[in-house]
Regions:
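SF2 helicase catalytic motif II
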Residues: 91-128
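Interdomain helical connector at the RecA1-RecA2 junction of SF1/SF2 helicase-like NTPases
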Residues: 117-275
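Walker A/P-loop
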Residues: 2-17
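Conserved Walker A/P-loop ATP-binding site and its immediately adjacent core
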Residues: 16, 20-21, 25-47
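Conserved RecA-like P-loop NTPase helicase motor core
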Residues: 77, 85, 105, 298-384
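Inter-Walker segment of RecA-like/P-loop motor cores
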Residues: 49-84
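Conserved RecA-like ASCE P-loop NTPase motor core of nucleic-acid helicases/translocases
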Residues: 27-35, 200-204, 268, 275-283, ...
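Arg/Lys-rich, glycine/proline-spaced intrinsically disordered segments
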Residues: 399-412, 460, 466
Length: 468
């Protein structure tokens, strides 16, 4: 079993861990943190520690392995990325491990490619053990050893490090078998059972809503840290939130509505004095007119992921124009793997990241009553932060309501002969590889639409458990 504590941003979680370790010099500890800056900051307060990261070593993995077998200091400070790599090698009972504000053992990425030859290279030369998951539209796979590959193949294989660096993964089968599917969505994760022999304490804001907790509730028992601070003024009394749209913000809306989004940027650049606020947007947000970037504000830009940043406390205003909403495929993969709902994923992904971003400002000071002003795009984002919200009317065109697009056509129907052949073959309960081979060899010359319908029929049969 692991222990955890759940305390709000700025409550002194890191300080409490450091105080515990300094007061118990005979305790061997490992402090796991997610930024170089935080690791350096913590090392300055720890009485007897060693930091091993890319700033202090050229052979990080090897040095950590050597240290955990023969420690030279009381406390080892390492990154969360390295902890997941070496954790299985740490001996039981030797260390108390503190995972500070690192809240996910899951990774998700997408790869966009429509070239069928490239897809074939991925399927046959990079991935191995591709297996369709019964009753789903997903497959699992591992990755082949690339040590004998040339430079080009090694570079291509690096695109799939998410598979190599985790214990298991799933992806949408359609990317391999449907020409018109251009995006491969991969979700991969660490198996926490590998670390169950260790004494690990996790701490974070709203830990019960983090992905690592939601996916592994059976592993965790709550245990509070000593010395946690309390606010003099409740956080909700210190927030004023403005928003611009009643519709949810999405990447597709940004791509299609750049002129509408530009209205928000123009307004904020008009009302906010330069350098009086910190702000963020998605890395992909860019819209240049005559070489001038329209999606730019005159504040202090920081990334969306702000865990560990303590240098924004002098600002009383911040702007969040990012969108971190999960895709429908990602939601389905999380539901299948961990039983995590779309709402839970949205809360853990976008809304918690937004909350962390807001908590970098003056509101981080617990003994202050100063109000922090926050600007976000959507009402949904605003309501996830506070009830004290107000809409700024900029005449932004809202999203269309869901419904069948004008001019859409009826579903594609297979020719009778092909439909009969497909029924007969599906009755044999083929595996994914058998189905692909049959379709490619026995159904040459079929259209993309036919191929897509056949794959959909195969997946539906898999979900039903095959023929009775």
């Amino acid at each position: 079993m692991f222990t955890y504590s759940s305390n709000e941003c700025g409550a002194g979680k890191t300080r409490a861990i450091i105080n515990y370790l300094n007061k118990n010099p005979s305790t061997k500890g490992i402090l796991v943190q997610n930024t170089m800056a935080l690791m350096t900051q913590s090392s300055q307060s720890l009485t007897n520690c060693k930091v091993i990261n890319t700033n202090t070593s050229t052979t990080v993995y090897e040095d950590i392995i050597e240290y955990i077998d023969s420690p030279t200091n009381q406390v080892l400070v390492i990154s969360d990325k390295m902890f997941w790599k070496v954790g299985e090698s740490i001996k039981a009972g030797m260390y108390e491990v503190f995972v500070d504000d690192s809240t996910s053992h899951i990774e998700h990425t997408s790869i966009t490619e429509d070239n069928t030859r490239a897809k074939g290279i991925v399927q046959y030369d990079i991935l191995s053990n591709v297996q369709q998951i019964p009753n789903t539209c997903f497959s699992t796979a591992s990755i082949k050893d690339s040590k004998d590959y040339g430079d080009l193949m090694k570079d291509l294989t690096k695109k799939f490090d998410i598979v190599r660096n985790n214990d298991a993964c799933i992806f949408n089968t359609s990317w391999l078998v449907e020409e018109e599917t251009t995006k491969m969505a991969i979700t991969a994760y660490k198996n926490l059972t590998k670390y169950s022999h260790l004494d690990i304490h996790f701490c974070a804001n709203n830990f019960e809503q983090t992905l690592i907790y939601l996916a592994n509730k059976h592993f965790f028992v709550k245990k509070d840290l000593d010395g946690i601070m309390t606010r003099t003024v409740p956080v909700q009394q210190r927030l004023k939130v403005f928003y611009f749209s009643d519709s949810d913000l999405s990447k597709s809306w940004k791509d299609k509505s750049q002129d509408e989004l530009a209205k928000v940027y123009r307004y904020l650049n008009k009302v906010l004095p330069p350098n009086s606020f910190y702000w963020t947007k998605n890395n992909a947000d860019s819209y240049k007119v005559d070489g001038v970037e329209r999606f730019e504000l005159a504040g202090h830009f920081i990334s969306c992921d702000t865990r560990g940043i303590n240098s924004m406390k002098g600002f009383d205003t911040c702007v969040w124009l990012a969108c971190l909403r999960p895709s429908s495929t990602e939601i389905k993969q999380y539901e299948h793997l961990f039983g995590i709902s779309g709402d839970e994923l949205l809360r853990a992904r976008e809304q918690e990241t937004l909350w962390q971003f807001v908590m970098r400002g003056c509101i981080r000071e617990f003994d202050s009553d100063k109000v922090q002003t926050v600007y976000v795009f959507s009402k949904e984002q605003a309501m996830s932060i506070s009830t004290n919200i107000e809409k700024i009317e900029l005449d932004i065109t809202e999203k269309r309501k869901n419904g069948r697009p004008v001019g859409s056509t009826n579903a594609h129907i297979l020719p009778d002969a092909l439909n009969t052949r497909l029924k007969r073959f599906l009755a044999t309960n083929p595996a994914l590889a058998e189905f692909i081979t049959w379709r490619n060899e026995k159904c040459k010359g079929i259209s993309i639409a036919d191929s897509k319908v056949m794959m959909t029929r195969f997946e539906k049969r898999q979900k039903k458990g095959g023929a009775k």
